[in-house]
């Protein structure tokens, strides 16, 4: 995590930079430091639901500022104990094959190459914890699985995932086979990494060994669908910030206050370092399908919650369709195409992505970048500053149901020549923040 500092508004005056002066911005030390990520659900992305239908969208995604495209699982889906008519993407029948719904391996290679031509990265979802019940491993290598008292395959304990069989990582042959499958997509298709499903359910020592092996082949980007410093120590570049998601949902419901967010950030800072990237999001495939759209969960606070997620230290995620204001729960086991319309929110998300790309104070990996929480007299204002020697970004978020007027913004450490980032204007004499919205100022 970035350095976390609490400062008081009274007397907290900072020197400002003239708006006519160019801000010196260096290149990040690694491409991931100012990267952004976009989750793509191949089945629901287009009417055909295949790889070829993604190609016309790539230049649009590039223009939005997307750096990493994450494809949900691309493998054949098991038929035994299948849920719904199409099944769960996370019930993998063969780790080295392509789901025929999506196309073939040649189509996939064209997609990978096209993404690389636009200087973007592609990672694919990987389900290492379990397979479908009709995966060939279940008959050829039954000892690779967790068996019940009757010597039968079983789903992961404590779940209703009756369509998948739990794997047993005490078996070294399984470990070798899984790493071999991970290497396959890097060696044969030149993908750039993996998003690893329920990563905390797979032993850390396996991940450490596997990721070390993968990185001998390529500098892959590894995302864990879990949180914990142990996963970063095992080699993962980024982890889900589920804790933040839960706190933000509770704040939206009125069950928690902004002090809960303060507490969470303090805990985060005590656990993670500047190279441990945390992924922030307002929605993803799980939240959308099972818990409700971002509009359902956040209600009136949708915009302020979005601004918060996109300005936190870490990396922001967009789930496909958000740029069109997606407000329906996509069915998980059936075809349910996204209604794209006119991409009504695309400019909004493009600005938020570009904020992170172009401002070095928003980058990861720099130990000299500081996150300062700004104290103020406004109970429902969550204010903070991210800065380094070249760049300063101040974020003011109004979680109140009424607009907020700030007459003396210099008490918040904002300079008179600061730029209102979203509106592209010099800061006015009096700041007016609409209800459940925010302001971002660049020095």
Give the residues covered by each predicted segment:
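C-terminal motif of bacterial Sec signal peptides marking the signal peptidase cleavage site
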Residues: 14-15
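Sec-dependent signal peptide recognition
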Residues: 2-7
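Aromatic/acidic polysaccharide-binding cleft in carbohydrate-active enzymes
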Residues: 279-343
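Substrate-binding/active-site clefts of carbohydrate-active enzymes
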Residues: 20-37, 43-68, 73-189, 209-216, ...
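C-terminal beta-strand-rich structural cap/linker in extracellular carbohydrate-active enzymes
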Residues: 428-443
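Solvent-exposed beta-hairpin/edge-strand motifs
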Residues: 410-424
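Active-site-proximal helices and loops of the catalytic beta/alpha 8
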Residues: 187, 197-278, 308, 325-355, ...
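Carbohydrate-binding surface patches
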Residues: 373-410
């Amino acid at each position: 995590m970035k350095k976390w500092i609490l400062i008081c508004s009274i007397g907290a005056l900072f020197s400002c930079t003239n708006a006519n002066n160019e801000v010196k911005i260096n290149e990040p030390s690694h491409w991931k430091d100012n990267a952004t990520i976009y989750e793509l659900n191949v089945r629901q992305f287009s009417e055909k639901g295949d790889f070829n239908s993604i190609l016309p969208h790539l230049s649009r995604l590039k223009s939005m500022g997307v750096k990493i495209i994450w494809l949900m699982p691309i493998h054949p889906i098991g038929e035994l104990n299948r849920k719904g008519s199409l099944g769960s993407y996370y019930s993998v029948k063969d780790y080295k094959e392509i789901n025929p719904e999506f196309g073939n391996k040649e189509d996939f290679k064209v997609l990978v190459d096209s993404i690389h031509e636009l200087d973007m990265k592609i990672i694919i979802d990987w389900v290492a914890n379990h397979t479908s019940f009709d995966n060939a491993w279940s008959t050829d290598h039954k000892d690779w699985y967790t068996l019940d008292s009757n010597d039968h395959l079983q789903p992961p304990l404590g779940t209703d995932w009756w369509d998948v069989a739990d794997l047993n990582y005490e078996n070294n042959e399984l470990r070798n086979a899984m790493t071999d499958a991970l290497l396959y997509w890097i060696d044969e298709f030149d993908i750039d990494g993996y998003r690893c499903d329920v990563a905390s359910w797979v032993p850390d020592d396996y991940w450490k060994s596997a990721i070390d092996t993968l990185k001998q082949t390529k500098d892959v980007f590894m995302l864990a669908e879990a949180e914990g410093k142990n996963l970063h120590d095992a080699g993962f570049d980024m982890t889900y910030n589920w804790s933040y998601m839960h706190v933000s949902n509770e704040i939206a419901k009125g069950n928690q206050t902004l002090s809960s967010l303060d507490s969470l950030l303090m805990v985060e800072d005590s656990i993670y370092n500047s190279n441990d990237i945390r992924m922030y999001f307002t929605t993803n495939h799980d939240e959308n399908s099972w818990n409700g759209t971002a509009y359902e969960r956040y209600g009136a606070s949708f915009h302020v919650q979005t601004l918060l997620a996109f300005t936190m230290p870490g990396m922001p995620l967009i789930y496909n369709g958000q740029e069109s204001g997606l407000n329906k729960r996509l069915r998980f086991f059936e075809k349910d195409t996204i209604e794209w319309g006119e991409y009504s929110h695309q400019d909004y998300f493009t600005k938020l992505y570009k904020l992170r790309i172009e401002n070095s104070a928003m980058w990861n990996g720099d130990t000299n970048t500081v996150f300062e929480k700004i104290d103020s007299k406004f109970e429902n204002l969550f204010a903070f500053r991210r800065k380094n020697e070249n760049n300063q970004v101040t974020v003011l978020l109004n979680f109140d149901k009424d607009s907020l007027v700030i007459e003396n913004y210099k008490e918040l450490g904002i300079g008179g020549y600061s730029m209102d980032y979203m509106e592209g204007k010099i800061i006015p004499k009096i700041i007016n923040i609409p209800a459940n919205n925010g302001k971002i100022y660049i020095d």
